[in-house]
Curated annotation (Swiss-Prot):
Function of the molecule: Hydrolyzes diadenosine 5',5'''-P1,P4-tetraphosphate to yield ADP.
Name of the molecule in the record: Bis(5'-nucleosyl)-tetraphosphatase, symmetrical
Molecular function in Gene Ontology: bis(5'-nucleosyl)-tetraphosphatase (symmetrical) activity
Family: Belongs to the Ap4A hydrolase family.
HAMAP family: ApaH
Signal sequence coordinates: none
Biased composition annotated in UniProt, kind: Pro residues: 309-318
Source organism superkingdom: Bacteria
Amino acid composition bias (Basic residues), ranges on this chain: 282-297
Keyword Hydrolase: yes
Keyword annotations from UniProtKB, A to Z: Hydrolase
Lineage of origin: Bacteria, Pseudomonadati, Pseudomonadota, Gammaproteobacteria, Lysobacterales
Region span, Disordered: 269-318
EC id: 3.6.1.41
Length: 318
């Protein structure tokens, strides 16, 4: 029996099949851990979602930001749904859409196997969260997603604010938890996420750190595998194993074997793309008062905890 973690699929069905062939995946014996972002941008999101759904008895999935956006789209009106990009539109118009979306909504934000010694998340953890705290906060949001009021949560999850604080309540609390688990790359030592910084370490604004290198972070008792940050590439450091290697951007799709003493990495080439992958911005001037309310002339009400306007229906928050 083997346990494999697999990076962001993002609708790359053919590439996913090639990777499963390369690791000799045997559903009778093996288990797959999918790090989230199953859909969007790859052109075969419906096929990819159906594939992972068909493997549900032999796999574990954590939700990524693109998966949550798909759920939000599925909960909207038919008129709004028809405005999404063609890749996601095929899912919301599919005959089996309800089965697929209902199953996706039941997936986790964090998966823990203490016997194996691993935790899987999509993006990141707050600097002060132990693995036990992370599990607890993940369950809070999972219960909302899996309950009867999930549509309200999906309508209220968009926005960069507020930053995490243990005293948050309501949708502010849920939004902060979702952002940490599904959108995090860089943050301050206090855990304020910087959603505009997406490049490789060294390109971020002053005072920001990769979430797994923040000064003062807690020591964690499990190894962590995650995806989300394609610009980072395959990175193993500080007990964190980041395996989103940009398959959808022409990079590679990565599988990491978790049940061996020596980590085994298997990769296949990603999607052929006609244009360049997104490039990181050059380092910028230090931000002042990061995470606090900005002046009225800047980017709307960035410091207001009220729910911002929704982004376009086909634009997941990265």
């Amino acid at each position: 029996m083997s346990v494999w973690a697999i990076g962001d699929l993002q609708g790359c069905y053919d590439i996913t099949q090639r990777l499963l062939e390369k690791i000799n995946f045997d559903p009778a014996q093996d288990t797959l851990w999918f790090c989230g972002d199953l859909v969007n941008r790859g052109g075969q999101s419906l096929e990819t979602l159906r594939l992972v759904h068909s493997l549900r008895a032999h796999s574990v999935v954590v939700l990524g930001n693109h998966d949550l956006s798909l759920l939000a789209i599925g909960a909207r009106s038919e008129e709004e749904q028809r405005k999404v990009n063609p890749d996601l539109l095929r899912i919301v118009l599919a005959e089996d859409r309800d089965a697929l979306l209902d199953w996706l909504r039941m997936q986790k934000l964090a998966h823990v196997d203490r016997a194996l010694g691993w935790m899987m998340i999509h993006a990141g953890l707050a600097p002060k969260w132990t693995t036990q705290m992370a599990e607890k906060h993940a369950r809070e949001v999972e219960q909302q997603l899996q309950g009867g009021g999930y549509r309200k949560l999906l309508r209220n999850m968009y926005g960069d604010q507020p930053g995490w604080s243990p005293g948050l309540i309501g949708y502010d609390r849920s939004r902060a938890i979702i952002n940490l688990f599904t959108r995090m790359r860089y943050c301050t030592p206090r855990g304020r996420i910087a959603t505009d910084d997406k490049g490789t370490p060294g390109t971020q604004a002053q005072g920001l750190y990769p979430w797994f290198e923040v000064p003062g972070r807690v020591e964690r008792d499990l190894k962590i595998v995650c995806g989300h940050w394609s610009a980072l590439g395959l990175t193993i450091t500080q007990g964190v194993h980041a395996i989103d290697t940009g398959a959808v951007w022409g990079g590679k799709l990565t599988a990491l074997q978790l049940d061996t003493d020596e980590l085994r990495v298997v990769q296949v080439p990603g999607r052929e793309v006609t244009g360049p992958a997104p490039v990181a911005r050059a380092p910028r001037r230090p931000r002042e008062r990061l995470g606090r309310q900005r002046s009225r002339g800047n980017r709307g009400n960035a410091g207001n905890t009220a729910v911002p306007a929704k982004p376009p229906v086909d634009t997941p928050q990265d």
